[in-house]
A protein has these predicted regions:
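Domain-level detector for long, ordered catalytic/regulatory cores in large eukaryotic signaling
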Residues: 1-134, 148, 153, 244
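Amphipathic alpha-helical/coiled-coil segments positioned at domain termini
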Residues: 1-32, 38-40, 124-174, 200-247
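Generic hydrophobic, helix-prone segments enriched in Leu/Val/Ile
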Residues: 43, 80-90, 143, 164, ...
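Alpha-helix boundary/N-cap detector
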Residues: 72, 76, 97-101, 159, ...
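Amphipathic, alpha-helical segments enriched in basic
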Residues: 85, 112-119, 123, 139, ...
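Hydrophobic core segments within long, regular secondary-structure runs in both alpha-
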Residues: 103-111, 162-165, 186-191
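Hydrophobic, Leu/Ile/Phe/Ala-enriched alpha-helical segments that form helix-helix packing faces
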Residues: 110, 148, 190-197, 246
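Helix-rich alpha-solenoid scaffolding regions
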Residues: 175-199
Length: 247
C-alpha cells in the first residue's frame, strides 16, 4: 500500500508542536522533526505559550480552538501543494525538474483533452501554470494529471502524485459512508506523500502547506463532511463585494 495571535497565525500551529527548520529562507518540516499533536484542552489551559500571547476569549464560550478551526482545502491543496508540485517540476531543483521535452509532452497531452461541460475550465499548458486557477489545479490533481503523467514522469514521482490524488479524492467524497470507509487509507496516503515528497523533491519542498496535509483528515472526522463543504472556495467569488463594503 502506498503507504489563528490569540489562536495562532495558522492552523498548523494550533494542531501540533512540531518545530520546523529554517533552510533557504523558508521553514521546512523534515521527517526527522519531532511531531506532537495539539489538543483543545491544553490550548484552553494556555499550555502552548510559544504560540499563544493570552488565553483566547473564545475559550470562555466553550469554543474549541484547535479542532473547530479547519484547514482550507482550496488554499492548502489546490493553490498550495498542487501548485507547488507543478512549479517544482517546471522551475525547481535540477534533480526533480522535468526536462523541456517532458513539459512539452505533458502540455500536448493536456491540450489533446476535451473536458465535459461540468468542468469550469478546459485544460491549459504547463507553460501557463502561473495563470492557472484553483479549479484547474483540482482538475489536474484528480482527473487529468493521473492520465497525462503516467508515461512521462518516473515511477516514484508518479506514485507520490497518485497518493495525494487518491487521498484527496477520498476526502472530497460526498457519500458519508464511502468516505468514512476509506478515510484511514487517505490518512496513510497523505503521510506517505509527505515523506515521499521529501525524497522526490528535496527537503525544501516540505513547507507548511505540505506538512499540514497530515492533519487534513481530522477536519473530515470532526465536521463529518466532505472537504468541499468546509472549503473557502464558494466564498471566493464574493470577496470583491466584501472589499467594497469595508472601504
Amino acid at each position: 500500500m502506498v503507504e489563528p495571535r490569540l489562536l495562532s497565525y495558522d492552523k498548523m500551529l494550533t494542531t501540533n508542536t512540531r518545530v520546523g527548520t529554517r533552510k533557504d529562507h523558508r521553514i521546512i518540516f523534515t521527517s526527522h522533526d519531532v511531531h506532537v499533536a495539539h489538543n483543545d484542552d491544553n490550548f484552553a489551559k494556555f499550555k502552548y505559550e510559544e504560540h499563544q500571547t493570552m488565553v483566547s476569549p473564545l475559550v470562555k464560550y466553550n469554543i474549541t480552538c484547535v479542532s473547530s478551526f479547519s484547514l482550507d482545502y482550496m488554499h492548502l491543496v489546490r493553490l498550495g501543494v498542487v501548485r507547488r508540485i507543478l512549479f517544482f517540476w517546471k522551475t525547481g531543483p535540477h534533480h526533480c525538474r522535468l526536462s523541456h521535452s517532458q513539459l512539452t509532452e505533458v502540455s500536448e497531452l493536456l491540450h489533446a483533452l476535451t473536458l465535459p461541460q461540468e468542468f469550469a475550465c478546459q485544460t491549459r499548458s504547463l507553460f501557463e501554470v502561473e495563470w492557472w486557477k484553483a479549479t484547474e489545479f483540482q482538475s489536474f490533481l484528480l482527473y487529468t494529471g493521473p492520465v497525462v503523467l503516467k508515461k512521462v514522469i518516473c515511477k516514484k514521482s508518479y506514485e507520490t502524485f497518485m497518493a495525494l490524488s487518491i487521498a484527496v479524492g477520498i476526502m472530497l467524497e460526498a457519500n458519508a459512508e464511502e468516505r468514512a470507509a476509506y478515510l484511514d487509507y487517505a490518512k496513510n496516503l497523505l503521510s506517505y506523500f509527505v515523506c515521499s515528497s521529501e525524497e522526490v523533491f528535496g527537503e525544501t519542498f516540505v513547507v507548511y502547506n505540505v506538512h499540514s496535509l497530515v492533519h487534513l483528515h481530522e477536519d473530515n472526522e470532526h465536521f463529518q463532511c466532505s472537504l468541499n463543504e468546509i472549503s473557502a472556495f464558494k466564498f471566493e467569488n464574493h470577496l470583491q463585494q466584501i472589499k467594497q463594503l469595508v472601504r
